[in-house]
Structure formats: structure tokens, C-alpha cells
Amino acid sequence: IARVAEAVERILDGVPLADDSALLVLENSAGGGNGIGESLDELIDIHEAMAARGLDLSRVAYCLDSAHLWGAGVEIKGDDEVDRLVEQFDKKIGLEKLVMIHYNDSKAAHGSKLDRHQHIGGGEVGTRGLAALIRHPRLAHVNYYLETPGMEEGWDKLNIERSLQLSEGTLKLKPLPAEEPKVKKAKKVPAKPAAKTSSAKKPAVKKPVAKRSVAKKPAAKKKR
């Protein structure tokens, strides 16, 4: 925790404050079993460690990733669980410091420490938890970003539509279409042109017919 706070201090010291300065945004992790910042308690500890070092916290903000929360074992399955998360964040850090949510479902089991993003409503978090996140009245100021898979295959449009449906209170979404396995298309090898055949018939060659020689019989002599 102390090393993270020290690293943030060095970053801020190395970038002079200006009118167009960007925020340094810290995001929770799924954990992987040995990471820092996987739980809300650890984010709170980092925040307090930075404050203890006298850092300018107006230059620091936070992002929560729903798939990371789920993988780390944070409960976000419904309204009550999300209420508790929001209340704890506001009490210890302040909701004004939460500027973005990476909005993803998860293929991983709850508390698995795995980071496996999934299409909206197609994973383990489910529509109730995701709807609770995007509809929460105290998170209206937050920007939501999709990090779902299949960007190059055109899935973004579908995930945006499903997110909007959840934001409007529609929990029953249509089943996701089957994902086609990525198969590399074989390069087409141009076919060799077929040998041209001449349709003109060769002139028939008549073989000479052998002439037969017919020997004439000698004329019979008349008897006197």
C-alpha cells in the first residue's frame, strides 16, 4: 500500500499541475491472487495512505470495473449489494472521486480472482446486478465504459443496446446470439488457366488404296 502511494506521489511530482492536466485514475483489480487494489478496503487503504503523504487528491480519482469486482469476490448481484458498495465508497473515499465504471459482465466465478469479461447479461454477474449498477441514482454522474469482447466482430452495438435496456429497467434480455469460433480464412489460390483445346478438326488423310494387278488369260487357240 505504501509503495503504491509513493508511486502516485512520484507521478504527480513529475507532471506539473496545469489547467489542462488529466486526472490520475486508479482502478480496482480482479486480484489474480496476489494483486493490490482488488477489494474496496484496499482502495480505501491506498486513498488514506496518499492523504497521509499530503498528496493533492484533487488530481486523483477512481474507476470501478464490475468484472473485477466480481472476480475479487465483491457482492454486486442486486440492489442491496450495490447499495452497500456505494455507501461504503462514499463514506471512506467520496462518490465525487468515482468518475468512471468499466461496465462488463464476467465469465468467471464469483471470487475466482479471474478477469474474464463477458457480454452484458451473458455472464455470472447477470442482469440484476448490472441493472443495479447502471440505474443507481447516486451514480448518475459516473461515466460508463464497455470493455466487452468482440469489438472487431461488431458486438459493441449489441452490448450498448442491452446496457440501455438495463438502464431503463428491462431485466429480461433476449438470449445472446451464438459466438462463431474465430477461424482463419484460407487464402484462395488462383486456379491455373486450363489448356486451350482447338476445336478445329484435322483434315483426314486418305491412305492410297493398293491397286490389284489382274493377269489376263491367254486367248485359247482355235482348232483347225
Language-model features: locations:
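Histidine-acidic metal/acid-base catalytic patches
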Residues: I44-R224
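Active-site acidic/histidine proton-transfer and metal-coordination neighborhood
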Residues: I1-A61
